[in-house]
Structures are given as C-alpha cells and as structure tokens.
Amino acid sequence: MGRPGNRLKQFAAILLFAGLAACAGAPSETQAPSPFAALSASANGNGFSENGLAALDVAMASAVDDGHVKGISTLLVRDGEVIHYFTHGIRRAEDQAPVTEDTIFRIYSMSKPLTGVALMTLYEDGAFSLDDPVTKFVPEFADIKVQQGADANGQPILAEMDHVPTMRELMSHTAGFGYGLGGDDPVNQAFRDQAVLGSPDLDTYIAKVAGIPLLFQPGSDWSYSTAVDIQGYVIQKISGKPFGQYLQDEIFAPLGMTDTAFFVPEAKRNRFSDVFSRNAETGEQTPLDAPRFAYREGAFGMEAGGHGLVSTLGDYARFCQ
C-alpha cells in the first residue's frame, strides 16, 4: 500500500552496523563493487566533503584494526541517493568471511524505531488516542503496583497507581516500567530474575511484566524501559495480527525490506553476522553461540519490538528514507 514511504522522510541518514569482536589483526578484505554503487552520487555535489568521508572510512577501519569491533559497515544516504558506502573486517570468525553489503546483523534497539512507526500507523488510522489508558489494550496491567522505596528488611514498599499509564506515557518512557538491563533496584532485578526479555512469546512476557511493580508513578519521571516491547503487544492486540506479521504487511513489504525479520531463514544463514564477546582485560573477542543469539525460525522467543529484529544496511536505509 506504500503508506510508510510517504511518512519516513529524512534529510540525511547515516547508518552504521558493527559486528562486535576481533583482535587487532583481523583481516581487511577488498569487497566486490557494491550494488549501491550504481545509485551513488557525488559527495561534493550533495553537501558532503570527499575528504571528510575519507576520514570517516579511516576512523571506521581503525575501530576494526584496533580491536574494538570485528567488522563494520557504513552507508550514507541523502534524498534517496547513496552518497557513500564502506565496509571493513569480517562478519564470521569460522571462515573469516568479510562484511558485505548484504550482511545480516542483529539490530537490537534499532528495532525500536520500526515498532514506533508501526504503532503510529495505527494512531493515524484512529485506532487509539494518546490519552487512552494502556489497560484498554492490556487489561493485565490494571493492578500493577508502584515501588516506593524499601522497608527495614529491604523489601519493597508498594503503593497503588495514581492513574493507569496512558499510551502517551508508554510511548515516551514515562509510564514507569523497568527493563532489567541495569539498576540494582528490586524492579529491574525482578526483570532479570524472571528473564522477562527472554520470554517465549508476548503473552508470557505481558504476564510477567504485569507482576512487577512500576519504578515510579506514571508520568512522574523518565526511565529507559521495556515500553517498546509492550508497544509491540499493543500493535498485536489492536491489529488482530501477530506483531511480526503486522510489521511485514505494513512496513517491510511496502518498503521492500526483504531481509528484516525476527529470525534468519536457513537460506540466508551464510549472510548472518556472528555476535562477539570482548574480554575487557585481554581484548580477545570470541563468537557467542548460545541459542538466544541464533535467531532461528521457531526458536527465537518473543517478537520483541524493543530489540528483536535482524536487518541489513540496505533494508534499514529504505526505512530511514
């Protein structure tokens, strides 16, 4: 239907994906001409300095050569034209396969803008108001409590919500939800203890979140949170489609984003980048092979709007434009 193409307009987009890992000696390989090259325009003619772009390439290559990341890829797009494209390093440790223009990366929190746009398509269709209570779509949240400190034994003191979080608060990280990515408070610790982000599906995820108190009264503060994952569930409830299917129908397919999804099919596994862990003391970086990093169909857990997608540089450029 093409609707997102009219909405996603930016003056310029610089995209950077990095496969984190590698020691300083990781090989650099010259790539075959990029499919982007046919679309390229003069950098100077589009307001960018050739010298500046060359310096960008040096800086990106240094991130690999100095052992900070395993591989890196950058793409500069303006007004629908590819101005500059660069890769350096490898995507896979086993055979030292280089990063290429079609390498598939785990994009983690860059999933969030896609979820946000998907939710806004429903908003523009009149499916919800910013002042709607979240419980209109997630009734499981009606009885969530609010943490208000701890007692002498270290147990959380809980209070009633003074109001149910609104969609506006959910969409601005002011609803009060935790996340579990940091913080030693009982709320974020509960997210970790219950492996909330590792839930097998969105229904299980929502049930877990409903049992964990808010960090603060809705609207009273800001905290980077699991709110975008909740937004994915709201999209599912409003649309009547699985969240991933809604993304496919309303964003990926109209924009021609053929490599963006919550899993990597077998036919594309060779293009999938490793994810690496870096030893802070030695600098050594090794690929992680736990199942949660594999992103295989049927085994990737919930469709997480906040962190769960994979994509390519080209796909994300289409989205940004």
Regions found by a protein language model. Name each.
Residues 2-12:
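Bacterial N-terminal signal peptides that target proteins for export
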Residues 21-22:
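C-terminal motif of bacterial Sec signal peptides marking the signal peptidase cleavage site
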Residues 33-44:
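Acidic/histidine-rich, surface-exposed loop or edge segments in extracytoplasmic proteins
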Residues 54-61, 74, 80, 105-138, ...:
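Active-site SXXK
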Residues 86, 132, 241:
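Short beta-to-alpha loop/turn elements within the nucleotide-binding domains of ABC transporters
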